[in-house]
From Swiss-Prot:
The gene is LETM2. Residues 449-461 have a biased composition (Low complexity). One of its GO terms (molecular function) is ribosome binding. It comes from Homo sapiens (Human). Residues 26-177 are mitochondrial intermembrane. This is LETM1 domain-containing protein LETM2, mitochondrial. Residues 208-235 form a coiled coil.
């Protein structure tokens, strides 16, 4: 009793005082063992540790009830949570339900990392911009070296191909674009305004700095503008045909019908264009065109639209001369020698469709242009206006749905079957069997191809059947039906 009371006093002292180790004064026996106590609300066990063997023993178990008098009582651990161990008398599933595991914050950390990766830091943005400008200048340096070789060949009397000539002109234009940037290098502290200048004027950079996605976006925007211009130019041609009906006669009506066919999707041929071009040789010259038509042609050829009418005509004449020279070079080398990108650029420079077509269609367009321009000698202004017929919107039009909830009226005529109102269809044949004998039912009548007609004619009342006569007629018909069934059963 004294020993257990001593242990209880020590336990109270441990909980009351902040000291973790309590050493007894009496040590008459060998201090080779230590008494370990875990004051836990869930797991309250007292263990005994042997320093020599380093083994733990539980005095609560049988066989360990005798304690060595030289033991030391030490508080080694104080916990406030439940030990995830098997407790005798309780299954493991109950412990799991009582103390659920807390979810680790790894999922939230991963989502946070994904969000951070989506939002680039300032350092990453700066590195991307530096790589972008480095690649642009590197490509420009390569073009400069190739252009130097081409110039050396020209100085030695060699002839360049169309592809090489276009590349040489492009590199020269790119170097001239770098001239305005020299001002930012000469003026002190003006280089800090370079980002603002590039943001406001992105086209001032050379062509090597332009990405493919930006090129596609520009081409799509220009294509949408050309479709609108094509509609405007088609309307101008129809108006000209209406004004000159007296001179042209039947040709004006043919032209108007032909324009409608083209607008619905008909593809114009070279013969038809040549036939109708003779009607506009004088009127569609650049000298006779108004300002709206000149502006539309300049936009079609991707030229500047500011200036007087004479300036616009001069721009168009110079552009048409360069196109004719390019056509002669293409005719010498052949259309088949051009790549897809070169075909698209050539069609775009001539005001034709360049997007949404296959390679064969692009080649066919270019060959038709050359036939009309070089062989048929069609005027250039009329040739440009004829190209507007090829700028047809390929996208299908949406189906127009009426705003009201009424269904659209259809013109389909439903033919209902017509029945011939004959006496045979209207007469009940049951009264005919009333006076026949049973023997007549046994012998079947001979089969003939002619239709069966009743032996005795039956006449219907001429007047309408009244309500008083209806029950008598129904009773007669029922009686005749019963007699016929009885006679058939007797047979």
């Amino acid at each position: 009793m004294a020993f257990y009371s001593y242990n209880s006093v020590l336990a109270i002292a441990r909980t009351r005082f902040p000291s973790h180790f309590v050493h007894p004064t009496c040590s008459s026996y060998s201090p080779s063992c230590a008494f370990l106590h875990l004051p836990d609300s869930h797991l309250n066990k007292t263990c005994m540790k042997n320093y020599e063997s380093k083994k733990y023993s539980d005095p609560s178990q049988p066989g360990n009830t005798v304690l060595h008098p030289g033991t030391r009582l030490i508080q080694k651990l104080h916990t406030s949570t439940c030990w995830l161990q098997e407790v005798p008398g309780k299954p493991q599933l109950e412990q799991a339900t009582k103390h659920p595991q807390v979810t680790s914050p790894q999922a939230t950390k991963e989502t946070g990392m994904e969000i951070k990766e989506g939002k680039q830091s300032y350092r990453q943005k700066i590195m991307d911009e530096l790589k972008y400008y480095y690649n642009g200048f590197y490509l420009l340096w390569i073009d400069a070296k190739v252009a130097a070789r081409m110039v050396w060949r020209l100085l030695h009397g060699q002839v360049l191909t169309r592809r090489e000539r276009r590349r040489l002109l492009r590199t020269c234009v790119d170097f001239f674009r770098l001239v305005p940037f020299m001002v930012f290098l000469i003026v002190p502290f003006m280089e800090f305004l370079l980002p603002v200048f590039l943001k406001l004027f992105p086209e001032m950079l050379p062509s090597t700095f332009e990405s493919e996605s930006k090129k596609e976006e520009k081409q799509k925007k220009k294509m949408a503008v050309k479709l609108e211009l094509a509609k405007f130019l088609q309307e101008t041609m129809t108006e000209m045909a209406r004004r000159n009906r007296a001179k042209m006669g039947d040709a004006s009506t043919q032209l108007s019908s032909y324009v409608k066919q083209v607008q619905t999707g008909h593809k114009p041929s070279t013969k038809e264009i040549v036939r109708f071009s003779k009607l506009f040789e004088d009127q569609l010259a650049l000298e006779h065109l108004d300002r709206p038509q000149l502006v539309a042609l300049c936009k079609l050829l991707e030229l500047q639209t500011f200036g007087t009418n004479n300036l616009l005509r001069f721009q168009l004449l110079m552009k048409l001369k360069s196109i004719k020279a390019d056509d002669e070079i293409i005719a010498k080398e052949g259309v088949t020698a051009l790549s897809v990108s070169e075909l698209q650029a050539a069609c775009r420079a001539r005001g034709m469709r360049s997007l949404g077509l296959t390679e064969e269609q692009l080649r066919q367009q270019l060959t038709e242009w050359q036939d009309l321009h070089l062989k048929e000698n069609v005027p250039p202004s009329l040739l440009l206006l004829s190209r507007t017929f090829y700028l047809i919107d390929v996208k299908p039009k949406p189906i127009e749905i009426p705003l009201s909830g009424e269904a659209p009226k259809t013109d389909i005529l439903v033919e209902l079957p017509t029945f011939t109102e004959s006496k045979e269809n209207m007469v009940d044949l049951a009264p005919q069997l009333k006076g026949t004998k049973d023997e007549d039912f046994i012998q079947p009548p001979p089969v003939t191809s002619s239709p069966i007609t009743p032996s005795t004619p039956i006449s219907l009342p001429k007047g309408p059947i009244t309500s008083s006569e209806e029950p008598t007629l129904q009773a007669k018909s029922q009686m005749t039906a019963q007699n016929s069934k009885a006679s058939s059963k007797g047979a």
